[in-house]
Amino acid sequence: MPTVLRWGPYRAFFYSNEGAEPAHIHVRSGHFEAKFWLHDLSVAVNAGFPAHEIGDIIRHLKLNREALLRAWKEHFGS
């Protein structure tokens, strides 16, 4: 599971077996994890993050969206 980005307590990464799904990123901090679709940065799954923290994460992902999409394409080849 390659890590693409780290900031503060967060780690953004891919699961290598999820390349058949649309482009997305997982973010983990402690025991919390969420999955975000990269095309619109919507939340696909949230396991534990409070709403205000999800908003902060989305803002950070938005700033790095192009790099995240590039990393997805490099890793999965699509």
Label every model-predicted segment:
Residues 50-78:
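C-terminal structural segments of small proteins and small subunits
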Residues 15-50:
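A short, structured beta-strand/loop element
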Residues 4, 26, 62-66:
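Alpha-helical interaction segments
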